[in-house]
Amino acid sequence: MAKSSLAGSDGALTWVNNATKKEELETANKNDSTKKLSVERVYQKKTQLEHILLRPDTYIGSVEPLTQLMWVYDEDVGMNCREVTFVPGLYKIFDEILVNAADNKQRDKNMTCIKVSIDPESNIISIWNNGKGIPVVEHKVEKVYVPALIFGQLLTSSNYDDDEKKVTGGRNGYGAKLCNIFSTKFTVETACKEYKHSFKQTWMNNMMKTSEAKIKHFDGEDYTCITFQPDLSKFKMEKLDKDIVALMTRRAYDLAGSCKGVKVMFNGKKLPVNGFRSYVDLYVKDKLDETGVALKVIHELANERWDVCLTLSEKGFQQISFVNSIATTKGGRHVDYVVDQVVSKLIEVVKKKNKAGVSVKPFQVKNHIWVFINCLIENPTFDSQTKENMTLQPKSFGSKCQLSEKFFKAASNCGIVESILNWVKFKAQTQLNKKCSSVKYSKIKGIPKLDDANDAGGKHSLECTLILTEGDSAKSLAVSGLGVIGRDRYGVFPLRGKILNVREASHKQIMENAEINNIIKIVGLQYKKSYDDAESLKTLRYGKIMIMTDQDQDGSHIKGLLINFIHHNWPSLLKHGFLEEFITPIVKASKNKQELSFYSIPEFDEWKKHIENQKAWKIKYYKGLGTSTAKEAKEYFADMERHRILFRYAGPEDDAAITLAFSKKKIDDRKEWLTNFMEDRRQRRLHGLPEQFLYGTATKHLTYNDFINKELILFSNSDNERSIPSLVDGFKPGQRKVLFTCFKRNDKREVKVAQLAGSVAEMSAYHHGEQALMMTIVNLAQNFVGSNNINLLQPIGQFGTRLHGGKDAASPRYIFTMLSSLARLLFPAVDDNLLKFLYDDNQRVEPEWYIPIIPMVLINGAEGIGTGWACKLPNYDAREIVNNVRRMLEGLDPHPMLPNYKNFKGTIQELGQNQYAVSGEIFVVDRNTVEITELPVRTWTQVYKEQVLEPMLNGTDKTPALISDYKEYHTDTTVKFVVKMTEEKLAQAEAAGLHKVFKLQTTLTCNSMVLFDHMGCLKKYETVQDILKEFFDLRLSYYGLRKEWLVGMLGAESTKLNNQARFILEKIQGKITIENRSKKDLIQMLVQRGYESDPVKAWKEAQEKAAEEEDSQNQHDDSSSDSGTPSGPDFNYILNMSLWSLTKEKVEELIKQRDTKGREVNDLKRKSPSDLWKEDLAAFVEELDKVEAQEREDILAGMSGKAIKGKVGKPKVKKLQLEETMPSPYGRRIVPEITAMKADASRKLLKKKKGDPDTTVVKVEFDEEFSGTPAEGTGEETLTPSAPVNKGPKPKREKKEPGTRVRKTPTSTGKTNAKKVKKRNPWSDDESKSESDLEEAEPVVIPRDSLLRRAAAERPKYTFDFSEEEDDDAAAADDSNDLEELKVKASPITNDGEDEFVPSDGLDKDEYAFSSGKSKATPEKSSNDKKSQDFGNLFSFPSYSQKSEDDSAKFDSNEEDTASVFAPSFGLKQTDKLPSKTVAAKKGKPPSDTAPKAKRAPKQKKIVETINSDSDSEFGIPKKTTTPKGKGRGAKKRKASGSENEGDYNPGRKPSKTASKKPKKTSFDQDSDVDIFPSDFTSEPPALPRTGRARKEVKYFAESDEEEDVDFAMFN
């Protein structure tokens, strides 16, 4: 074998294949040759060139023809993927030369053109490129010219220096030489301007022959041209066929797309490709997705090395990728690198949108992606010389491809996600068909409680009916009835309540719903099968389904859900009369042997109106199927025609009706549907028309449209009634039933919650589970922060705390409750006579609504989700509402109000219309410590700890730990987290905003203020003022009705007493004789003498008659003209008097009662309805003061311990234990920043105004039973806080002029203080009509010194001068006179030294200046007389919210916050300090309530001194011998706590300094006044001595508003 003398070629040892040797041996044996092959023939060595030719697949791939799908470019079709037959080796040698040309672009950026020429006829291929040529110079080592070296000698390359980072395709030193070796002729032409020579040389016969190199002088532009004729015989080809040319053409297009800045000429024509994006269009143009829409390509040039395009693939994952211009047709790690990023983002989107419930894995997402990648990678590696799969690790790419969020967002909207979801839906359907479909079996096993029809699944299956019952008890009724009609054709299966709304259910829900799957299996249904013809119906086991549910609204809902189930999956079945229902009587009336059945309440009501002598009939209500006996069941089934109602399909309107009721897309239509229903019902009631009902005596069938619009709509309306409260009383029906029962029981002693629930169910006909009822009672009694502002029931026991948001309430078996003393003041008993009481089972139950004296729906808030609507209302301050009512009674507009949660110490600030920012409180104590002392409303302490602080402490994979430690010092009512963090992180957190970092801000949005109005219609209110005004008009009209009722009742009683007195006097005088006379004669005599039949009884009967006539305006004339006293005159009230009545004493007493009653009537007649209302408000506020005072006293007693009787010493309470729960006095308050939140709110509002639909949370699925208690925190509130029975003073709400919207301590508007010496009303001036003047409807407002408690002022007692007739002018004059007297009585007594009062009007709402050092208080303040000094230590700790937005302004200016006698914070009595509440000042908040009677301030010596000063500092009670321990933020130095451990947190120690001791004293130093007294608790000067009853000792508390609970019962 000849050896080539080619320089530089290495020998290769070739091992002969064993199979070849074996074959040669066998041949030798066959030839009877006993000689063996020589060793030399067995073991051979080949040159590298020989090896390449002998084993080409090692280098260029297979040289055998291969047929496969490839992207090619055909002249007539363009870029297309088709089956082609080609030789991979030939394709590869062409590609090597092409990639070399492209590589030159990386060496010379000036290269601009590549020319590719293919001549199939001549078998000539030429590739030309400009740019830097190959150096035409002799290689000094190899002694040959460089072009000859690199094209004509193996293992030569310019790419062997791996230290040099190159982004070229060449790597191994084989490429161009392989093309040379597999060509019959291979010519290289190049010109190098640098060396001023051109070079041309030709190799022939597989690089075995070489011509002489032609070198010429050259001074033109550099270029390189390779021309070769492939050795077709080596590739078993005769010519370059169409397929290989199409493939090579595509590679030319590849180069045009992947080489930036290079134009590619193909056979003399420029290819129409401009960049990579243009190249991608060759693949996707004219291609449509499954919906017929053109494919959308997402393109991003990530950087100069990465160009990525993405679109939808419908043929599994596809990729077209290039690495340094090499077509990596099998992909590689560069493709995975990009695709993994895309998949991870898309799968997040898919999971959010995936309602089917089928799990989606990354590879399934990848199957819908078509990606195009053009990248430059440094020194890439491949798994073979063919370079189809790039194997370099991403870390070695030399660059990163970071795709933008814009790219990912566009990718999620380009059709890929939709395609995935469609695939998921298809897969879900396949799974459903596999698991949930059924076939026709004669017997079914494995379904418990199924009583199968004997003929089901047989030849009579179409005649079989499956009865679906509501529960097991209904099944028993059906089985009893089957004794009449037989079991062959009827099967029974009980449902476990409401079935799934399959229209909106996920795939997972349907797959896992046993009930749905059981019905499918029993009936023999198959998903996606159309039951249009009779043949398909024969595949079913049952020909009909009969629905047998209770005749109530929940039963109607179950019917609707079953109709929806069949309609959604097999609509054609409805057209065949597949569904029917079995109805049972809801009421039976019987008399003697006559029995009437009624199938709807309206039908029964109509019958009652026309029947005489109703009492002769026995009425029985059937609330459920379980009420019927087995005997009645047999009667029902015996008369099957009467009780079976067929559902008849009437056309598209039926489809539309079912979709309307159950589709998520029909939310707005459902609102309109229910609104029209409520309006229709209201009009019917107004005109006395009967309500519509379905099941008359002649009803045999029913359309689906009628069922939805006349029966199912009752459930939807009922759902709203149970979920959404009434504007009038703020209650849902469950809450109203509880209150009704409590009023009726009128317990004077506490009762167990569990027992009360049973009583409610009995007295008010409650038809649901008692567990829900018990939770309603518990929620009505809760009073922690974030629950009720006024709890109508008393929480005697553990009713839940702010730690867990009420979920930590004890079992109802262990806790007690009873009515609050405020309940009957809010809901006066006399108003019960005006209410419309409802009847259930012929039993008188709760009224349609109660009518409180103030809108409870605002005080305790409301929340609920119904059908089509949702309701959300925050809490508001009771006193603020009282003040607004008083303003409205005076004809003034109500002041705007901000939400207010009792005992909440944070701030609530307005962001926009009905949008508020709720902020907790955080203080910076030192360089690495912050203190959190309040959380946003309804952010529960435990939840906050677990969801916010724990992740901050432990960190996550993505975010490092922010804090190093935290300690907890809170109680069940207060919050205190002491958080440690590094100085650097604290600085960073403060720069970012501590409230934001610690998640201490939430938003409260009130755009769903939907309530039932007094007519029972749902109405959406835009503002709280709208609610208040509508309530005001209704309540005022009811005060008029109350007055009418009282005048009538008192008049009747007066007449009765007058008749009794006259009768006694006439008997004594002998004018009347009754002895020995018949009853008839006596009655006739009394009538003749002008005595009236019992006036009280007659008046009551007249009232009842009037009510009946109002309810039944359409009755006959004869029934309406019946006498009010059909039994004749009633004189028992006279004739039944005892003989004792004839005595002188009794006669005088009777006459006195008569005269008193007459005066009462006259007095009442002189009062206006507004007078009655004012009296009720005054009584309520007075009792509210007492209740809150008692609450504070209870807290104080619990915190300070009991003092030993007779001793003044402090109780044994550890100082540090009390201090550690209190805020540090040295912290720097962080002002909540809401600028960004305001901007965001403005953007949302603007967007909404542009036409965005209302975003209301609605219940769209009817398959969930109403739970009554929506999840706490709904969209607007992330974490929900609760409230303490505050141990610290209540944050102060400061009043601002209208226009400012930050809640602070309420002050009078525009009123100035007066000096004590003048002894005149500081507010009295000539402008008595001005809005700021004190009027009888407005409370007396006492200015408050920022250091001293406000003086006790007497509460004005409202007195009505009834000596004059009721006339407007006279009344106004009286009011004015009374007012002047009231003003003088209530004048505040201020210190002589206090000359000026700075009203709060001028304070800026964002002013949160913090006074950390000495106060700027004027010397006059510190030099107050001894009386005021003795109050100095009171309320020495502020709540964290005290340093409110204008605290320092208040301190610096000696501002006296004018607070009403009925202070809205706590309702303190006149001597009680009005705590501040930074629930952000209410806009133009009016002065608080009017005060009934002012009381004298306690003398100094009567200060309670037995209470420990430590605990005093917590509640504001001073101890003479110690400095106060308070929440004050100033420089007041505290006594050292005794702890020597500097590292431990000590709330009593000032950071970085030792607390200096102060001498014991009872008054404050001037320097310390401001810091010790927060804006919440400032002492006030005592009132001047005056006559009147002495006031008992005052208990001072730190809390403001009463223990309020947000009505969590409102969620029931």
Swiss-Prot record:
GO terms for molecular function: ATP binding; chromatin binding; DNA binding; DNA topoisomerase activity; DNA topoisomerase type II (double strand cut, ATP-hydrolyzing) activity; metal ion binding; ribonucleoprotein complex binding. Residues 1362-1379 have a biased composition (Acidic residues). The modification Phosphothreonine is found at T1280, T1390, T1562. Belongs to the type II topoisomerase family. The record marks I865 as: Important for DNA bending. The modification N-acetylalanine is found at A2. The lineage of its organism: Eukaryota, Metazoa, Chordata, Craniata, Vertebrata. Disruption phenotype: Knockout animals have B-cell developmental defects affecting multiple stages of development likely due to transcriptional defects. These mutant mice have altered splenic follicle structure with reduce marginal zone and follicular B-cell zones; immunophenotyping show decreased B- cells at all stages of development. Mutant mice fail to mount an antibody response to vaccination and B-cells fail to proliferate in response to stimulation, indicating deficits in B-cell function. This is DNA topoisomerase 2-beta. The modification Phosphotyrosine is found at Y1358, Y1408, Y1596.
